[in-house]
């Protein structure tokens, strides 16, 4: 069995490959000792690691491991997944939305990191907790899926009520900017959490589009663990990308790009 692991700040993504078949699983980074214990009990012919906590795993296992830079691993793994899923892109920006968000440009040959922001899954969990007292990510994202942002976010169309706006009316003018106009509204946890996911998706998308225009590509690929159990985030990102004139791509198992890439970079 061959194993690739991306040990991130919040989640550890694990890919096992045997007989040309892959299996995927995740574990919370706070349970890294359990991952180490599991690895020490397996018969592994190749182990490849990436991510900020790769060194912690390597220091505590009884088998040799190779460690790779997470940006290179993510790019390698993403390229494999894009090809397997039928996406033939000459170049693209990819946004890796994990705890935070890292932005990269792939020119057809290699990747380069072109930016990063602190907005991502960490903000969804942290700000989401402050607004709802929910700590479980699945419960939080489940609750957000049917939330209504209309009384919370101020849209361009809310400002240009009786005239044609100079930009699309569905663009957000101010996240959370509609709240003071609806003080008698029922701001349910579901609505508040939907607004949090909205601001994360729109900020990530805006940054991705900005660098896409800088590098003259219309293709933006979104990956990362923040999309897990979060159809709303995916919809916000895809809709906003199209609204701003670019082409969004979502890759199945994209959160495991780093783990897959590390495995294929390994000798």
Swiss-Prot record:
Keyword ATP-binding: yes
Any Gene Ontology CC annotation: cytosol
Catalytic residues, chain numbering: 70 (proton acceptor)
Residues reported to bind ATP: 6-13, 99, 121-125, 137, 225
GO molecular function, one term: ATP binding
Entry EC number(s): 2.7.1.33
Compartments where located: Cytoplasm
Record-level GO BP terms: coenzyme A biosynthetic process
Name of one Pfam family that matches: Fumble
Catalytic activity from the UniProt record: (R)-pantothenate + ATP = (R)-4'-phosphopantothenate + ADP + H(+)
HAMAP family listed in its UniProt record: Pantothen_kinase_2
Function: Catalyzes the phosphorylation of pantothenate (Pan), the first step in CoA biosynthesis.
Subunit structure of this chain's protein: Homodimer.
Entry protein name: Type II pantothenate kinase
Organism: Staphylococcus aureus (strain MRSA252)
Lineage: Bacteria, Bacillati, Bacillota, Bacilli, Bacillales
Name of encoding gene: coaW
């Amino acid at each position: 069995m061959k194993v690739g692991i991306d040990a991130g700040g919040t989640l550890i993504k694990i890919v096992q490959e045997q007989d040309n078949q892959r299996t995927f699983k995740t574990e919370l980074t706070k349970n890294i000792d359990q991952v180490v214990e599991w690895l020490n009990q397996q018969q592994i012919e190749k182990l490849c690691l990436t991510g900020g906590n790769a060194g912690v795993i390597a220091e505590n296992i009884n088998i040799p491991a190779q460690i790779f830079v997470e940006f290179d691993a993510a790019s390698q793994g993403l390229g494999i997944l894009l090809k397997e899923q039928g996406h033939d892109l000459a170049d693209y920006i990819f946004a890796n939305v994990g705890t935070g968000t890292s932005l990269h440009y792939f020119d057809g040959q290699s990747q380069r990191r072109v930016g990063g922001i602190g907005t991502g899954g960490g903000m969804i969990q942290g700000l989401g907790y402050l607004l709802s007292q929910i700590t479980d990510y699945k419960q939080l994202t489940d609750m957000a899926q049917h939330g209504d942002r209309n009384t919370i976010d101020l849209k361009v169309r809310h400002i240009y009520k009786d005239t044609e706006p100079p930009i699309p009316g569905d663009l957000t003018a101010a996240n959370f900017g509609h709240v003071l106009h609806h003080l008698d509204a029922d701001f349910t946890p579901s609505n508040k959490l939907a607004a949090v996911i909205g601001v994360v998706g729109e900020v990530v998308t805006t940054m991705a589009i900005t660098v896409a225009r800088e590098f003259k590509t219309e293709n933006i690929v979104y990956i990362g663990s923040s999309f897990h159990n979060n159809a709303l985030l995916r919809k916000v990102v895809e809709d906003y990308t199209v609204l701003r004139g670019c082409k969004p791509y979502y890759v199945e198992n994209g959160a495991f790009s780093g783990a897959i890439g590390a495995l294929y970079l390994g000798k």
